[in-house]
Regions:
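Hydrophobic alpha-helical segments
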Residues: 18, 24-25, 72, 92
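Post-cleavage N-terminal segment of exported redox proteins
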Residues: 1-23, 100-108
Length: 108
């Protein structure tokens, strides 16, 4: 019985979506170091309608881990590219953090 339980747990762990496998604490640290200057509390001081709030992310098709990772990696318009400044893991973590905070409306 214990073997079946362990097998089930191992299988379940392999099925965890990448956003949940991210290190949100690391994502928060990256966000504080690199993003908060323009995106304090999920806002946007450069383009006020393109915030990191859930509604705006959905409106602009940025509400998936892949979309946020792509814009962090490659940048777009006034958004700087971070592919040469952050590791893939940091990009994944900060993208997951952004989506997590957006889902919580940037409240603690």
């Amino acid at each position: 019985m214990l073997g079946i339980l362990l097998a089930f747990i191992c299988l379940w762990l392999t099925l965890i979506p990448p956003a949940f496998a991210a290190d949100l604490a690391n994502g928060a640290a990256v966000f504080e170091a690199r993003c908060v200057g323009c995106h304090v509390n999920g806002g946007n001081i450069v383009r006020r309608n393109k915030t990191l709030k859930q509604k705006a992310l959905q409106k602009f098709g940025m509400d998936s881990i892949e979309a946020v990772e792509a814009i962090v990696t490659n940048g777009k318009n006034n958004m700087s590219a971070y592919k040469d400044k952050l590791t893939e893991e940091q990009i994944h973590d900060v993208a997951a953090y952004v989506l997590d905070r957006a889902a919580a409306d940037w409240r603690s």
